[in-house]
């Protein structure tokens, strides 16, 4: 059994449902200590965070991952118990196999092999793991990055092991992500009888013209790497349930996924302007989950594309699609950030799995990326 598969199995059998770590990071820290890494625990609010580093010189290359997983759901929906790693028909089954304990195992094994071959490698290597990626993502990577920034630490390259592949390993990798901005809007009216609308103020009617404009607005045109910003209503609630009562208030939740062409502050100002222009009496609270980031060129891009091409025979597509990841906390630091991992077809589903051959190839790709960036000059 390979080092990658063995470690992946050991991680999967630990039921680390977010924000629990269940000993996963201790296992990794022990493995990395044997390879000359120092470990620092930056835990906060019940979240386990490991920062392990070898070397102090620049450039600093960081593998970023998470050890927490989403709940398994009904065990009856699984072919095998979700926290009992099973290899069947060439695939490793278990919660976290693809998202993202398989990637963690692959990059730890790659680091071990690289350090053994190049004990005097250039720069420094770090591994950052958190148990708060699948949850609120407040006390995990975000907190660690803030701590490192306060120390003046600079990360040059960051590879996030998120499952980026679509149909085959390495066919696609992320070079950026859109930002996410959520608004919690309360439209204030006055409750009354539907037969006497002149004695009430219907918040639904008051908001309707503004909603039409919000939905029709072109926020930006995107660019070569990012689609235009999208505005989506996710929840609307109003009324008492009775058919003869005009509601006194309406709650609306909306989200914008936005490109670097526009800022969160600009979007907030434009939305407030629309609401005021339509005379909507409202209260609006914002939650900014993360700014967009993009790595459009650089040594990390070159290393990833060369390594993937060498092991798959095809250059990976660059993509910025999908939801947010912890890469959003690394992007603003100035680091070159990419996401590269296994297939995402079964993530968060029953019978989550990853091909064992893909895990082995992923370890080799990660190893080659380190070779390109940190191998000592001959």
From Swiss-Prot:
Keywords: Amino-acid biosynthesis, Cobalt, Diaminopimelate biosynthesis, Hydrolase, Lysine biosynthesis, Metal-binding, Zinc
Catalytic reaction equation(s): N-succinyl-(2S,6S)-2,6-diaminopimelate + H2O = (2S,6S)-2,6-diaminopimelate + succinate
UniProt pathway annotation: Amino-acid biosynthesis; L-lysine biosynthesis via DAP pathway; LL-2,6-diaminopimelate from (S)-tetrahydrodipicolinate (succinylase route): step 3/3
Annotated residues for binding of Zn(2+) 1: 66, 99, 162
Cofactor: record remark: Binds 2 Zn(2+) or Co(2+) ions per subunit.
Pfam families: M20_dimer (PF07687), Peptidase_M20 (PF01546)
GO terms under biological process: diaminopimelate biosynthetic process; L-arginine biosynthetic process; lysine biosynthetic process via diaminopimelate
Enzyme Commission code(s) on record: 3.5.1.18
Any coiled-coil regions, as ranges: none
Domain of life from the UniProt record: Bacteria
Active site: 68, 133 (proton acceptor)
Named cofactor requirement(s): Zn(2+); Co(2+)
Family: Belongs to the peptidase M20A family. DapE subfamily.
NCBIfam families named among the record's database cross-references: dapE_proteo, PRK13009.1
The protein's role, per its UniProt record: Catalyzes the hydrolysis of N-succinyl-L,L-diaminopimelic acid (SDAP), forming succinate and LL-2,6-diaminopimelate (DAP), an intermediate involved in the bacterial biosynthesis of lysine and meso-diaminopimelic acid, an essential component of bacterial cell walls.
Assembly mode: Homodimer.
Protein name from the UniProt record: Succinyl-diaminopimelate desuccinylase
